Amino acid sequence: MATQAATGEARATSASMRSGAELLRSLDDGRQVFLDGERVGKVVEHPAFREAARQIARLLDIAAAPELRERMTFVSPKTGAPVWRAWQIPRTHADLKAKRLFSEAWAEATFGLMGRTPDHVAGFFTGFAAVPRVFAAGGQQFADNVVRFYEECRDNHLYASYAIVPPQIDRSKPAHRQSDPALYAGVVKERDDGIVIAGAQQLATAAVFSDYLHLACIHPLQPGDENYANAVAVPINAPGLKLYPRRPFARERMSSLDYPLTSRFDEADCFCVFDDVFVPWERVFIYRNLEVSRDQWWKTPAHLYGNHQAQCRYATKLRFMMGLAKRMNEMTGNDANPAVAIQMGELAAFATIVDSMLQAHETTATVDADGILWPSQTTLYSVMALQSELNGRMLEIIRELAGAAMITLPSSARDFDDPTIAADIDRYMQSGKADARTRVATLRMVWDFLGTEFGSRHAQYEKFYGGASFLVKQNVNRFFDYKRATAMVDAALALPAVEPARHL
């Protein structure tokens, strides 16, 4: 396709690291993004996307920094050039730790507030490419396509997002029994040179900033749903692909002084519509195959690698949350209060559990017969199962610690521009440990983290991004070592009888 070729020309060659500036330039490629009743002209110039795009571009520059070369890259086995470590297939525990250090560097640069940075879907495709025989069950050409696409993304530092959940139209019915067969994204035509996709899919976070969209389905599909049992990669600027972001929280004239997080890190969750989108065969990984559509997630380490990155990001976010709570207590003078110390201890325990579980599913990872390292499924899914509950409790504690501090602040940063107003603020809103401007800035950030639309979206995101909690708990149940547990019960039941003690 001419569109695909044009997109590729804007990217870095495999002999060099892709820069943030190159990423930003590549976004001006005719992609169809619709917001507030009109098509967005240039993503990088629109106030809803501009700053988030710059934050992602900064991540590419971090990865390309010469002083971080060892931490952020490994040598491509195909080109010999440095490439993002996110694309490394881990074969040793040291490899998996190195991938964590890569993701932590990006997560720390965004304070854990951007969940779909380029390393996330990279984890999934790394897992797919690690076990291509799963895709070969539908035909060897599909396995070859997966590996080629993985190598292209790896060697050209490409950014893929994904849409893997069908729209919530009528979940009581399978895909093929919806009122219109083209509601869910599926195949509507097969051609000699590829297939045509029509329908909708969600939830493509950060798709507006990406090079490719991976369309697949992680929901269980039933017999009769074959037209929806596909996996493909589509350029974001492909004709017929339309992105509908939710209402952006970063808006025009929004001050970063008042909304320091919203203004920078709003990722843009997108609803995707495929209006007869053509996909050439070389970008098709699964075609009308229910079994492979299911197995791609569970018989490859893709789901584990992608969520390993997600837990790196989440553990980093919790450290940021702990820092916010600590600074807030300092600003309010409550840091030495014994009751506050108890609540902070509870927060610290939760943050430590997540970080410890992250390291545990690395150290308990196992190597399969092909030499591929698989993170511990039980450990990973256990922390994911706890996350929705722990995160809510942590936010509740910070709200309790804050009291009225977050809502007794000046109306905006412009209040400091008026000498009379500023004089009152400087006098009455100071802290015992900081001046008024520092106190207000700190508490504004806490409010942006907790109380704004941005904060509410994050609370919802952490609750559901890994799937509904009951599904995650089913995964824990599926992978728990019941054999070892029940063997102990059987051993206890088989203990020899003990003669009753005689009374003296």
Regions found by a protein language model. Give the residues of each.
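Acidic/polar, glycine-rich intrinsically disordered N-terminal extensions of enzymes
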Residues: M1-S76
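Generic structural signal for well-ordered, non-transmembrane alpha-helical segments
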Residues: R50, R54, E151-R154, V196, ...
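Glycine-rich flavin
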Residues: F74-Y212, C217-A231, N237, K242
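Charged/polar positions within long, soluble alpha-helices
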Residues: V165, E330, S356-T363, G392-R399, ...
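FAD-binding core of flavoproteins
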Residues: P167-R313, N477-L504
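Extended amphipathic alpha-helical segments enriched in small hydrophobics
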Residues: Q309-V367
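Short, charged, amphipathic alpha-helical segments
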Residues: A341-G345, L373-Y381
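Alpha-helix capping/hinge segments and adjacent helical runs
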Residues: T378-L504
